[in-house]
Amino acid sequence: MLLDAGAQYPAIGVTTFGSSRHHSAGDVTDREVALGINPFADGMGAFKLNPSSHDLASGQTAFTSQAPGYAAAALGHHHHPGHVSSYSSAAFNSTRDFLFRNRGFGEAASAQHSLFASAAGGFPGPHGPHADTTGHLIFPGLHEQAASHASPNVVNGQMRLGFSGDMYGRPDQYGQVTSPRSEHYASSQLHGYGPMNMNMAAHHGAGAFFRYMRQPIKQELICKWIEPEQLANPKKSCNKTFSTMHELVTHVTVEHVGGPEQSNHICVWEECPREGKPFKAKYKLINHIRVHTGEKPFPCPFPGCGKVFARSENLKIHKRTHTGEKPFKCEFEGCDRRFANSSDRKKHMHVHTSDKPYLCKMCDKSYTHPSSLRKHMKVHEASSQGSQPSPAASSGYESSTPPTIVSPSAENQSTSSLSPSSSAVHHTSNHSTLSSNFNEWYV
């Protein structure tokens, strides 16, 4: 596709596609110079962003040729270098800065963050065509960068938007002009083409784009099934490793659990708490094995929930929390309580029958609901902690405090607790001892 951008971007060195323009140095008018039009650009030009003349080395100007025929005939190399430089710098830079600021072009991290190839390619110069062809790559960051380039992320102050397959770069013999300003514009302008920014910085190397893609965590799932013939000491488990849960479950079901010909449904997984107690049906054994493998094949279908379950019955009960369904009504006359599952209704029925099946093992109290028993057990936990030295006193808090810091009133305090003022003093006095004590508490 040919794009005529000359009328729209006259101030950034963009020429019209399709027709060649041949000028001599004498044809350059003051108006063209002030507008930043490059009279020596060929018809197949593209975006050319050059730094100002004061940023370039001697012998270079703010405008260079883009066509092969004028590779050595830039304005700075021949007739009127001083004339062109004096008129071009201020007008070109101010217009370019205003254009890119108002068109919302963002800034990128480096020159490699854009679609445009770096300064390399088959651009013919006075010494013949350049041998390197990495400039023709649409995404050179995904391929190996040429080791012969001294600075592959520098585009020598130029950025060209051409055709796919015709991404030309500047040859190395003209690649000696670099400056912070040229690198800045080469990396930041035209960042608006964000959906195609697939190249990363040159120092990341080839394929660095893929570091932003989360790599799946490789896991090894080990089969700990012990065959009946290997039950003799020392017991030897299967120990086959698998990379996916599906492979492990298929292996256990087919090779260990077996088909309908198996009459004994016994779990012989390593350290299984059932200790060889058989199941009445095969499906119950398969459901039990999920405790060992961690398989949970029943996800909640409601969006945003994300919970998964090992048993379909548990999923069915869980879905009632989303739907609000409570199919189990209290059977006691006059009670209209309803429940999502039968176990909750059974616990509730003890309120009406005055049964207290939940006994405290530390005293003679009993309760109708397990939640009441859990609250009661906290009383025993608090009393047991009160009869013994508290963690703060037994972990060396007072022993780690210098005697000059502790007041006489603080020394007479109970060892079971510390006041906020004294604890604050201890906290500021010895940080290393305090951190070690916390590690001891929560291990």
Curated annotation (Swiss-Prot):
Residues 408-443 are annotated as: Negatively regulates transcriptional activity. Induction: By chrd/chordin, zic1, zic2, zic3 and zic5. Suppressed by bmp signaling. Keywords: Activator, Cytoplasm, Developmental protein, Differentiation, DNA-binding, Metal-binding, Neurogenesis, Nucleus, Repeat, Transcription, Transcription regulation, Wnt signaling pathway, Zinc, Zinc-finger. The C2H2-type 3, 4 and 5 zinc finger domains are necessary for transcription activation. Removal of the C-terminal regulatory domain increases activity. Belongs to the GLI C2H2-type zinc-finger protein family. GO terms for cellular component: cytoplasm; nucleus. GO terms for molecular function: DNA-binding transcription factor activity; DNA-binding transcription factor activity, RNA polymerase II-specific; RNA polymerase II cis-regulatory region sequence-specific DNA binding; zinc ion binding. Residues 371-433 are annotated as: Disordered. The keyword rRNA-binding does not apply. Residues 397-413 have a biased composition (Polar residues). PROSITE patterns: ZINC_FINGER_C2H2_1, ZINC_FINGER_C2H2_2. This is Zinc finger protein ZIC 1. SUPFAM superfamilies: beta-beta-alpha zinc fingers. The gene is zic1. InterPro entries: GLI-like, Znf-C2H2_ZIC1-5/GLI1-3-like, Znf_C2H2_sf, Znf_C2H2_type, Znf_ZIC. A zinc finger (C2H2-type) spans 221-256, 265-292, 298-322, 328-352, 358-380. Transcriptional activator that induces expression of multiple genes including pax3, en2, snai2/slug, feb and a subset of wnt genes. Has multiple key roles in the regulation of neural induction and neurogenesis: acts as a neural competence factor, sensitizing the presumptive neuroectoderm to respond to subsequent neuralizing signals. Promotes both preplacodal cell fates and neural crest cell fates, two of the cell populations that arise from the neural plate border. Cooperates with pax3 in concert with wnt signaling to determine neural crest fate. Its main location: nucleus. Residues 383-396, 414-433 have a biased composition (Low complexity). GO terms for biological process: central nervous system development; dorsal/ventral neural tube patterning; neural crest cell differentiation; neural crest cell fate commitment; neural crest formation; neural plate development; neurogenesis; positive regulation of DNA-templated transcription. During early gastrula stages, widely expressed in the dorsal ectoderm. At mid-gastrula, expressed throughout the presumptive neural plate and at late gastrula, expression gradually diminishes in the dorsal midline and increases in the anterior folds. By early neurula stage, expression becomes restricted to the lateral edges of the neural plate, corresponding to the presumptive dorsal neural plate and neural crest, and in flanking ectoderm. In early tailbud stages (stages 22-23), expressed in the dorsal forebrain, midbrain and hindbrain. It is found in: Nucleus; Cytoplasm.
